[in-house]
Structure formats: structure tokens, C-alpha cells
């Protein structure tokens, strides 16, 4: 097998690997965002019903909602990179010659990668003690589900949890930053392979303006037969 064929085979293997992992990551992100958004909405609604109809409340509703919102935001940051939802400035890329756009894009994604890796390291260092020497540290109000009591044997020396241990909701930090780092690696690979020349894939204002122009054009075409009929 020639060197060219070997390089081509390695390229397709890398592309296939990124594609499979990317699809799996898509499923995780979409499931977590949908689950926590739905659960947060239902919990808030149930708490309102309890308060106004039964003069009672769900004690752990506020704390649970805060943790679910944190999960949704941290996972949503990764999902936003995938869908190009984040705000970016591409003035330099637009005025740069085509041969330099890839370089500018690689510099931008390298800065984002450095930032996300620092966040990943910091979030891991913050979360890790809560699953080791601080595994006993529980949340204030959220009860521990019976189906998760097996974790007590794994990390809490068999001592049963009454409330949800903090390492479970705090896991949003390393998981969210790991997903974010992977998304930046994915963007970097797309830039290297020529699929993208920038991290920003769309411009919301320009897209809205184009849509408005199209609507005005259609409205003008619809009015033309009526105007011509009146002239006759």
C-alpha cells in the first residue's frame, strides 16, 4: 500500500471516528437538555399548584431547579458550539484574503480550546473531592432516590445517603466542559479538513434581513397583477 493510500485511509478513519463520537455526543446533549428543561418546567409547575391550591410546597423544588438549570446551561454551551449559536466577531476574517482565513480560524479555535481545557481542569479539580474525601457531603433538601443508594457502597463506605450527594449535581461541571472541549476539537478538525473557514457559520441579522427582502419581493409580485388590472 502506498503512502498516499495510507494517509487517505487514516483520514477516513479519523473522519469516521469523529462522526460516530459526534453523533453520540449529539444524542447526549439533546437528551440532557430536553430532560432537564422538561423536568424543571414540571417541577416548577407542580410547586406552584402545591402552593396555591394546597397551601404547601415541594421543599426541594428550588434547589432542584437551580441544579437542573446549571446542567442545562453547561451542556447547552457545548450544544451551542455545535449549532453555531454563540456570538462571534468575524470582521477580520471577512476582510482577510482566502488563504489567511483558515489560519485566523485555527488561531481562534486554539484560543477557545485553551480556555475550555483550563475550565475542564478547574472543574475536575473542584468536582473530584466531592466523590472522594467529601463523598458524604449532601445537598440541602433533595432526597436521595432509592435506585441510587448503591452509590453509598461505592463512594461512602456503605453509609446510606438521606439526601442526594453533591457529587451528582456537581458532575455538570466536568461533563459540560468535556463536551465543550470535544466540540472545539470537532470544529478544529472541520477547519483543518476544509469543511469550515470560520467558527461562525451564520449571521442572524443578515439571515433575518434576507428573509425580510424575500417577503417584500413576494408581496410586490403579488401586488403587480392587481396594479396592472387597475391600469387597464
Swiss-Prot record:
Pfam families: DctQ. One of its GO terms (molecular function) is transmembrane transporter activity. Its main location: membrane. GO terms for biological process: C4-dicarboxylate transport. InterPro entries: DctQ, TRAP_DctQ. It is a multi-pass membrane protein. The chain crosses the membrane at residues 30-50, 58-78, 103-123, 167-187. It is found in: Cell inner membrane. Keywords: Cell inner membrane, Cell membrane, Membrane, Transmembrane, Transmembrane helix, Transport. Part of the tripartite ATP-independent periplasmic (TRAP) transport system DctPQM involved in C4-dicarboxylates uptake. The complex comprises the extracytoplasmic solute receptor protein DctP, and the two transmembrane proteins DctQ and DctM. Belongs to the TRAP transporter small permease family. This is C4-dicarboxylate TRAP transporter small permease protein DctQ.
Amino acid at each position: 500500500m502506498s503512502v498516499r493510500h495510507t494517509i487517505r485511509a487514516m483520514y477516513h478513519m479519523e473522519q469516521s471516528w469523529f462522526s460516530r463520537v459526534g453523533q453520540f455526543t449529539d444524542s447526549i446533549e439533546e437528551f440532557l437538555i430536553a430532560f432537564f428543561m422538561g423536568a424543571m418546567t414540571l417541577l416548577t409547575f407542580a410547586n406552584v399548584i402545591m402552593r396555591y391550591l394546597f397551601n404547601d410546597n415541594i421543599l426541594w423544588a428550588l434547589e432542584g431547579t437551580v441544579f437542573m438549570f446549571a446542567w442545562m446551561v453547561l451542556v447547552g454551551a457545548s450544544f451551542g458550539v455545535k449549532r453555531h449559536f454563540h456570538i462571534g466577531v468575524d470582521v477580520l476574517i471577512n476582510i482577510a484574503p482566502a488563504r489567511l482565513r483558515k489560519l485566523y480560524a485555527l488561531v481562534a479555535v486554539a484560543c477557545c480550546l485553551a480556555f475550555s481545557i483550563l475550565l475542564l481542569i478547574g472543574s475536575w479539580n473542584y468536582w473530584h473531592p466531592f466523590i472522594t474525601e467529601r463523598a458524604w457531603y449532601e445537598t440541602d433538601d433533595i432526597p436521595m432516590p432509592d435506585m441510587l443508594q448503591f452509590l453509598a457502597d461505592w463512594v461512602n463506605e456503605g453509609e446510606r445517603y438521606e439526601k442526594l450527594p453533591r457529587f451528582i449535581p456537581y458532575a455538570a461541571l466536568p461533563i459540560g466542559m468535556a463536551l465543550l472541549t470535544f466540540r472545539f476539537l470537532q470544529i478544529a478538525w472541520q477547519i483543518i479538513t476544509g469543511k469550515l473557514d470560520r467558527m461562525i457559520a451564520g449571521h442572524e441579522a443578515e439571515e433575518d434581513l434576507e428573509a425580510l427582502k424575500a417577503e417584500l419581493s413576494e408581496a410586490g409580485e403579488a401586488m403587480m397583477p392587481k396594479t396592472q388590472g387597475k391600469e387597464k
